[in-house]
Structure formats: structure tokens, C-alpha cells
């Protein structure tokens, strides 16, 4: 076997399953895999899954060029409050900024509401004298002796494991923070230090301080995890690059991940959006709703012209998971998506009012849904899907895991139907209707906020449960077109292989367009580009392959929040003022449906995204031949009732095949059920494309079309 490094592996650690995709560029081989997540030791599932994929493809660990993975470790650490003991050194007088926050109520109707608990208690927050003005000039020198005494006290008396340094206006001039790190390193060389001017060099001291503290909070844990994972993989013989997915959809090096682990807060979900963007672009779909439904949550985001929407702020560790404002603010680039507690493992129960409620509690992988026969007793969405015919009890994970249909029937009858006084069939249908309506309502609101109409989009469904629920969701959204990629159940792991190595950076510099110092703006970009180039070259890139994209956060003077606007390639000058203004007005009109022609426009932050190209990967399979139709089973479709449905072996289909619904398409990791009003076509990339409401007479009947195809 050649020892040339030709294999890339993507790994997605989810709440229920860990998904894998292996791609060998020379052999043109792509193989997927799925294992139950091991929450007590996340790296174990990774190592076991990689070992299995290598064995199945007759490969060696020495052939692996890179392993890219996303992790929920940062998110879980913040949610569970299991991070390091952190100390904060700030400007004197700003010790309590974390508790003061924005001084707003996230729920005006809840008189007993509690803010998200701060992760750095007051005893570990201390201010020191020294001040930088808003224009970057030094107003008062840093009190270095007081700083040293404060750090000694925090480490020796309070036992802090990591420090955050956040001085006022450091985004404009980081000199005091840089000097502080020098002093701390001389005192405690091994202490991990986060500077707010490096992790979030933008205005708004509360958000910047919160980001720095949360970065310090998760840093020791991520250092340990990444070191352990690297050692475990090295024992397999792996000597390639280990890379991590960023929350914004790019891929970064282990060194960057260790320095700024907070940028991995949405690492896992971003991969699904990147996979959706890659698939949509290859298929020529300009407007797509990415719908990723796994075992724990459902995530939706918009993908337009081959790129997912992104935003530059995020809220972590919410007291109420789905209430905006109840968490801790972060200045990080993330894929702009909505997430609701509606996954295959979401538990259905009768609440105190005698009504059925689904989620956000999830059965996860342990004990899992009742169908898994691993000790679960509470019925879940997956159990309802099995009961209603959407899943094949003998072909879950390609037959690796038999599903316990009798146990599911009994659990729904005793836990739900009995308490509600309804038939078991109605209870199962109720679970599915509730979860579909929850996802539809969240998607409608997300799109309405952006002035978008779902009817003009294609629903791209993936995740283990996404294709199962795609038809029901599409009907509620009045979407007419559904696309289901091959390997849909592991498509998030595929996203790691098609995401580009990337650096996102920003600098705060506030000024009105007509008075901006454009030379200073160009200096900011020169610094950001130099740093980005260094990171990407260390990641193995070539200088000529690096693509730089500039953007800025602009607003009308006096507004509290801004909108991102793409900038022309630099260097910039006063001659670009009108082009920047026009771009802002267009973006503002698209979002708010109005503009104010005479109001001054103000720039807040200047952003850079630098990336390398990525080698295209396809999950297309080679048709197995034989007859695709496996028989029939009864499936309940909303609006049609129980319908005898053709069962199709997806692996036997080839491009150009057409199937009139109702039909359920089975593959190892997921199933797609197309209703009676669908016509499904297999495109050149082996995507299933379902047209809802298409004229079924124009499509061949399943038996005839598929018989002729073979």
C-alpha cells in the first residue's frame, strides 16, 4: 500500500451520533460511517470510527493527509459551567461590567427572571490604573506594580487557571494589554492569558470583556482535549494535519484553536451549513434553506449564491435556551442559523396542563429513543417516525441497529395516548405534527426578520432526521422543492471536507464616511492581512492561492447596531466613499425596506476574511444495479393519511431516474419520504430532487421507470 498521504477524513461529534466521511483523492473513494457518541470521552468515538473506516477501505493511518473535526466541547463547557477558574484584570472602575451587562430585561413579562450567571465572580475581578482614550492616545500610563500585585493575588490566593485582560479602548490601542501579558508571562510563564484586543478587537466593552473571559474559561480544557486527541491519533500512526472547524464555517489549525477556542463555540453546526453551501452551488441552486435535523436539535440557515449567511455576534450559555438576551454575548463570527430543541431524540411528554409537549429535552445517545432498546422509556420523535412508517426497523444504520417497534408501540400507548385519552396512532401523529410545526414557525420567523419568503427557496434536508421530516416541513412552509444529498445522514461530516482553511479578523475604528482617515483603514487591513497570511501559510497554503475579502460594519449615525457591507478590494481612499455608501444603502434597504438618504453614515468595524481553496469532494455513489424497489409499506403523510408507499433502495438509483410519490428512499444513515404529490428526480450528483405538486403524469410510475432503468 502506498504511503502517500491522499486521505482526508471529516468527523462530526453530535449529541447522539459521531459521523465520519473518508475521502481518498487518488482512488476516488468516499466512505461514510456513524458511531454512537461517547460523551464521557469524545476522542474515543473518533479513534474507533477512524480505525473502522481505515479497515473498511484497506487503508493505513500513515496515508491520512488531514483530519478535520468539529467539537461541541466548547458549547457544552459553557452550558454546563464546567470551565476553568478564571481571573479578570480590567481598567480600574470597570470591575463590574460583566454583571451590569446591557441592563435590559430579556423577558419583560417574567418578574422573576434571572440573568445568565457570570463566569468570573467579583472576588476574581480586579481593576488597575491606566487608561487609553477613545482615539487610541494614552491618557494615563499602566500601573505595572499594581498589575503584578493583582496577578499574584489572583494566582496565589484564588488559584486561577487562566487570565483574561480587558482594558478600556484596547481595540484602538492594545499597548497596555500587550505590556500586561509581558508582565504576567514573566511572573507565571505557564499561565494561559487571553487579551481582549486579540480575541475581539471591537467596540463595546461588555461584549469584548465577555468574549475574553469566555475564551479564558474554555482554554485549559481545549488545550487538554486537543493534546489528548492528537496523542490518541498518533498512536494509530496518524502523522498528518489535525484541523478544527470554526464557528463561521472555515477551518483552522490546532495552534489557532488553542489560542482562540471560543471561536469554536458553534464548530459542529457550521459544518452542516458549509456542506449545504457546497451542494447547493454544485447543483446551481442560488437560494436554499439548509435544514439539518439530528438527534438533539434542528438547525436552519439560509444559503444564497453558494455561501451561508454569517453574523459577527453570538449568545452563549442562555438561561432560557431559545430566549434571546438571556445568555452571555460573544464577538465571534458564526454561521447565522436558528436552532430549536427538535431532534430525533426529543422527548414527547404530557405537561401539567394535560397537553402534549415535544422537546427540548433529548434522550441523546444514552439511553436514547425507546426504539434503540438501550434503556430509553420515554417516547421520542424517532419513535413516532418509526411507528408512522418513516423508518425501516430492519434497515436502521444499514441494518446494524435493529429498532424495537413493539417497545415503541407500548411506550407511546402508555406514556402518551393513555394520559391524553387518544388513540396510539393519533399520539404518534401528534408528536410529528408538533415537531414539524415548531420547526416551520422558527424558520418563518428567521426568514421574516431578513425579509425573505420561504416559497422562493429550495429546502436542502440532511442530518439523520432531516430527510424524514423534510416533506412535512416543506408543506408547512409552502416550499415546492426539496433536495436530499447522498449520504444525507452524515452530511455534516462531509462539510468538514469542503470547508476552506480560513482566518476571520476584525478591527474597531469608528468614524463617519466623510471624515474617515482612509490611510488608517488601509493600515488596519495591512496588519490583518499579514497575520492571516502567516496563519494560512503555516496551514500549508501557497501565497498565490490566498483570497482576501474585505467588509465593514456600517450604520446611520446614532444607531445602536450596524449592518455588514462588502467593500471593494483595497487599498481604499476617499474615491471609494460613494461606492461604500451605495453598498450600505442597498444592504439597508434589503433588510429594512427603507433608507434615509440624507443621514450621515458611520463605520464601526473593519473585517477581513482570508481563505484558501479546497479540493472538491463528492458523496455520489456507484449504482449497485438490480431493482431499486424493495416492496411497499404503509406511511402516514400529512393531508393524505395512511398510504401504501413504494420502498426504494437509494443505492440502486442513477442520474435521470424519476419516481412518482408516494415513495420512501432508504440509505444507511437516513430515509427520505416523498408524499403522493411529489415527483422525485435523481440529478447528476445523485441528489434526490422532489418537486411538490408536480404533474405526476409526466413522471413514469415507480415500477415501470425503475424496471426500465435496470
Question: For the regions a protein language model found, what residue spans apply to each?
Answer:
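Conserved phosphate-binding/catalytic loops in two-lobed NTP-binding clefts
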Residues: 186-211, 478-494
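Glycine-rich phosphate-binding loop of actin/hexokinase-like ATP-binding domains
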Residues: 20, 31-40, 87-93, 113, ...
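Short beta-strand-loop/turn "lid" adjacent to the catalytic site in phosphate-handling enzymes
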Residues: 31-34, 61-104, 164-177, 200-214, ...
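N-terminal glycine/serine-rich phosphate-binding loop of ATP-dependent small-molecule kinases
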Residues: 1-87, 133, 140-164, 177-196, ...
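Conserved short loop/turn motifs at secondary-structure junctions
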Residues: 65-66, 164-173, 215-218, 428-433, ...
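Conserved phosphate-binding loops in N-terminal lobes of ATP-dependent enzymes
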Residues: 10-13, 17-21, 29-45, 50-51, ...
Amino acid at each position: 500500500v502506498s504511503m502517500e498521504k491522499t486521505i482526508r477524513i471529516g468527523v462530526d461529534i453530535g449529541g447522539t451520533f459521531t459521523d465520519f466521511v473518508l475521502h481518498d483523492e487518488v482512488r476516488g473513494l468516499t466512505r461514510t460511517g456513524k458511531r454512537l457518541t461517547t460523551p464521557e470521552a469524545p476522542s474515543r468515538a473518533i479513534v474507533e470510527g477512524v480505525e473502522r473506516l481505515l479497515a473498511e477501505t484497506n487503508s493505513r493511518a500513515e496515508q491520512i493527509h488531514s483530519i478535520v473535526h468539529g467539537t461541541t466541547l466548547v458549547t457544552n463547557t459553557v452550558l454546563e459551567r464546567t470551565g476553568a477558574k478564571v481571573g479578570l484584570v480590567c481598567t480600574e472602575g470597570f470591575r463590574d461590567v460583566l454583571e451590569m451587562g446591557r441592563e435590559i430585561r430579556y423577558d419583560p413579562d417574567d418578574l422573576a427572571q434571572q440573568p445568565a450567571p457570570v463566569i468570573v465572580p467579583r472576588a476574581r475581578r480586579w481593576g488597575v490604573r491606566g487608561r487609553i482614550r477613545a482615539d487610541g492616545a494614552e491618557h494615563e500610563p499602566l500601573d505595572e506594580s499594581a498589575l503584578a500585585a493583582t496577578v499574584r493575588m489572583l494566582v496565589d490566593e484564588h488559584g486561577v487557571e487562566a487570565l483574561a485582560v480587558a482594558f478600556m479602548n484596547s481595540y484602538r490601542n492594545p499597548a497596555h494589554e500587550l505590556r500586561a501579558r509581558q508582565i504576567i508571562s514573566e511572573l507565571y510563564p505557564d499561565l494561559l492569558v487571553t487579551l481582549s484586543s486579540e480575541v475581539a478587537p471591537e467596540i463595546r466593552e461588555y461584549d469584548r470583556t465577555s468574549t475574553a473571559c469566555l475564551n479564558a474559561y474554555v482554554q485549559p480544557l481545549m488545550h487538554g482535549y486537543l493534546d489528548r486527541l492528537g496523542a490518541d491519533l498518533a498512536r494509530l500512526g496518524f502523522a498528518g494535519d489535525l484541523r478544527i472547524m470554526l464557528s463561521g464555517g472555515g477551518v483552522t489549525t490546532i495552534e489557532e484553536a488553542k489560542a482562540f477556542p471560543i471561536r469554536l463555540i458553534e464548530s459542529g453546526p457550521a459544518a452542516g451549513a458549509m456542506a449545504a453551501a457546497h451542494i447547493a452551488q454544485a447543483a446551481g441552486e442560488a437560494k436554499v434553506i439548509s435544514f439539518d435535523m439530528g438527534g438533539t436539535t434542528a438547525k436552519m440557515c439560509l444559503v444564497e449564491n453558494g455561501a451561508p449567511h454569517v453574523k459577527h455576534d453570538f449568545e452563549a450559555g442562555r438561561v432560557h435556551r431559545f430566549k434571546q438576551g438571556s445568555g452571555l454575548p460573544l464577538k465571534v463570527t458564526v454561521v447565522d442559523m436558528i436552532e430549536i430543541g427538535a431532534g430525533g431524540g426529543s422527548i414527547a411528554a404530557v405537561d401539567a396542563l394535560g397537553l402534549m409537549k415535544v422537546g427540548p429535552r433529548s434522550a441523546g445517545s444514552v439511553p436514547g429513543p425507546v426504539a434503540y432498546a438501550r434503556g430509553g422509556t420515554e417516547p421520542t420523535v424517532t419513535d413516532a417516525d418509526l411507528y408512522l412508517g418513516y423508518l425501516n426497523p430492519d434497515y436502521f444504520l444499514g441494518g446494524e441497529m435493529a429498532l424495537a417497534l413493539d417497545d415503541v408501540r407500548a411506550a407511546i400507548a402508555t406514556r402518551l395516548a393513555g394520559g391524553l385519552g387518544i388513540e396510539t396512532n393519533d399520539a404518534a401523529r401528534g408528536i410529528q405534527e408538533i415537531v414539524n410545526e415548531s420547526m416551520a414557525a422558527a424558520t418563518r420567523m428567521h426568514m421574516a426578520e431578513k425579509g425573505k419568503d420561504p416559497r422562493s427557496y429550495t429546502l436542502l434536508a440532511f442530518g439523520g432526521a432531516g430527510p424524514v421530516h423534510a416533506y412535512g416541513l416543506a408543506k408547512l412552509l409552502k416550499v415546492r422543492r426539496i433536495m436530499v444529498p447522498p449520504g444525507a445522514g452524515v452530511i455534516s461530516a462531509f462539510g468538514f471536507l469542503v470547508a476552506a482553511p480560513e482566518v476571520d479578523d476584525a478591527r474597531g475604528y469608528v468614524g463617519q464616511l466623510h471624515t474617515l482617515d482612509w490611510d488608517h483603514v488601509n493600515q488596519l487591513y495591512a496588519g490583518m492581512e499579514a497575520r492571516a497570511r502567516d496563519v494560512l501559510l503555516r496551514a500549508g497554503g501557497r501565497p498565490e492561492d490566498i483570497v482576501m475579502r474585505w467588509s465593514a460594519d456600517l450604520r446611520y449615525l446614532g444607531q445602536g447596531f450596524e449592518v455588514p457591507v462588502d467593500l471593494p478590494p483595497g487599498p481604499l481612499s476617499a474615491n471609494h466613499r460613494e461606492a461604500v455608501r451605495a453598498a450600505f444603502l442597498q444592504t439597508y434597504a434589503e433588510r429594512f425596506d427603507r433608507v434615509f438618504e440624507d443621514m450621515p453614515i458611520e463605520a464601526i468595524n473593519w473585517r477581513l476574511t482570508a481563505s484558501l481553496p479546497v479540493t472538491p469532494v463528492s458523496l455520489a455513489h456507484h449504482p449497485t444495479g438490480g431493482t431499486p424497489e424493495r416492496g411497499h409499506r404503509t406511511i402516514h403523510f400529512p393531508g393524505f393519511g395512511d398510504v401504501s408507499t413504494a420502498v426504494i433502495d437509494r443505492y440502486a438509483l442513477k442520474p435521470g431516474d424519476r419516481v412518482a410519490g408516494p415513495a420512501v428512499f432508504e440509505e444507511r444513515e437516513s430515509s427520505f419520504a416523498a408524499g403522493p404529490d411529489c415527483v422525485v428526480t435523481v440529478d447528476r450528483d445523485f441528489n434526490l430532487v422532489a418537486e411538490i405538486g408536480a404533474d405526476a403524469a409526466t413522471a413514469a410510475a415507480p415500477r415501470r421507470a425503475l424496471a426500465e432503468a435496470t
